[in-house]
Amino acid sequence: MKITAAVARSAQSDFTIEDLELEEPRDNEVLVKIVGVGICHSDISARDGQIPTELPVVLGHEGAGIVERVGAAVTTVKPGDHVVISFATCGDCAPCHNDQKNYCEAFPALNMLGIRLDGSKALNKGDEIISSHFFGQSSFANYALTYESNVVKVRSDAPLEILGPLGCGIQTGAGTFMRAFKCEAGSAVAVAGGGAVGLSGVLGAVVQGCHPIIVLEPHSE
């Protein structure tokens, strides 16, 4: 199908808006019409060669939208469902089975290389192959092809245009205090940096009952 996407073609350069061809969903894949997407520093790092993603590539990994079509083996979502897209995991390794999917043994291959596990890519522009499946989604586009394993269904009245960062930045910050540190109520915490990830960490600390919560920000003077 024809889509419009922001393509990263070289390091330190602007993204270009281009018309591309996107494959139909495979058995375990979900086609999502993107409503909103965040931009993360990891997208810039991939464009600039700090993450080993082959250029040209469609980046974007904080997508949210509406399911358009699903592959034959998909059972957890259906067309019309509202979803947030997070990182991809294999579901078969020990960390995945132990509810530690962020430590998935296939994480680099599934998320950072711009390919499926079989080495294929889902995007092209004529004879030119474009890297896809960045963090299992490549959501800097009006449509993204993702995996069933990394879409999370949300309420139909949830504001999709602002939910995308739940897939990366917000869970990174909040998860630090709620899952990694498992802070107990009354714990004193300090957060260095009051950006999106830092403030999400503050919210996670509030949920855990931490006190005091201190945010450190550089001062221009």
Positions of the model-derived regions?
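Extreme N-terminal starter segment of soluble prokaryotic enzymes
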Residues: 2-4
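Extracellular beta-rich ligand/substrate-recognition surface
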Residues: 7-14
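Short Gly/Pro-enriched turn/cap motifs at secondary-structure boundaries
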Residues: 21-22, 54-60, 132-136, 142-143
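Glycine-rich beta-strand-centered segment in the early N-terminal region that forms part
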Residues: 23-37, 47-97, 110, 153-157
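Cysteine-cluster motifs in flexible loop/terminal segments that predominantly coordinate metals
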Residues: 87-149
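Mid-domain Rossmann-like dinucleotide-binding core that forms the NAD(H)/NADP(H) cofactor-binding site
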Residues: 142-143, 149-151, 155-221
